[in-house]
Amino acid sequence: MAGRSGDSDEELLQTVRFIKFLYQSNPLPSPKGTRQARRNRRRRWRERQRQIQSISAWIISTHLGRSTEPVPLQLPPLERLNLDCSEDCGTSGTQGVGSPQVLGESPAVLDSGTKE
């Protein structure tokens, strides 16, 4: 893949194909049978999925030599964060939308409910 150093494109593609094969080797369980049988099949399927996920993480970390987790984003400390609305903050494009209407007298729907 473009911009990657340390491993070739073919090695990365081969690893991805192998992990894809692992996931395809565990199809969804059949919806047939009693409730208990379906529940047991789903439980075994979920366990196999967890095993495949851990094997895939191991393959990526050892074979390709990189972490499965993305690099964490470095955020500034909370003390430095502030909201300063002295400037035009977030109102662009919303001017005139939902502006309040001032009525001379209250409409009939707000009357006390007595008929004249």
Swiss-Prot record:
A motif (Nuclear export signal and binding to XPO1) lies at residues 73-84. Belongs to the HIV-1 REV protein family. The gene is rev. Escorts unspliced or incompletely spliced viral pre-mRNAs (late transcripts) out of the nucleus of infected cells. These pre-mRNAs carry a recognition sequence called Rev responsive element (RRE) located in the env gene, that is not present in fully spliced viral mRNAs (early transcripts). This function is essential since most viral proteins are translated from unspliced or partially spliced pre-mRNAs which cannot exit the nucleus by the pathway used by fully processed cellular mRNAs. Rev itself is translated from a fully spliced mRNA that readily exits the nucleus. HIV-1 lineages are divided in three main groups, M (for Major), O (for Outlier), and N (for New, or Non-M, Non-O). The vast majority of strains found worldwide belong to the group M. Group O seems to be endemic to and largely confined to Cameroon and neighboring countries in West Central Africa, where these viruses represent a small minority of HIV-1 strains. The group N is represented by a limited number of isolates from Cameroonian persons. The group M is further subdivided in 9 clades or subtypes (A to D, F to H, J and K). Keywords: AIDS, Host cytoplasm, Host nucleus, Host-virus interaction, Methylation, mRNA transport, Phosphoprotein, RNA-binding, Transport. It comes from Human immunodeficiency virus type 1 group M subtype B (isolate SF162). Residues 89-98 have a biased composition (Polar residues). The keyword Ligase does not apply. Residues 18-26 are annotated as: Homomultimerization. A motif (Nuclear localization signal and RNA-binding (RRE)) lies at residues 34-50. Residues 24-49, 86-116 are annotated as: Disordered. Residues 35-47 have a biased composition (Basic residues). Asymmetrically arginine dimethylated at one site by host PRMT6. Methylation impairs the RNA-binding activity and export of viral RNA from the nucleus to the cytoplasm. Phosphorylated by protein kinase CK2. Presence of, and maybe binding to the N-terminus of the regulatory beta subunit of CK2 is necessary for CK2-mediated Rev's phosphorylation. It comes from the Viruses. This is Protein Rev. One of its GO terms (biological process) is mRNA transport. GO terms for molecular function: DNA-binding transcription factor activity; RNA binding. HAMAP family: REV_HIV1 (MF_04077). InterPro entries: REV_protein (IPR000625).
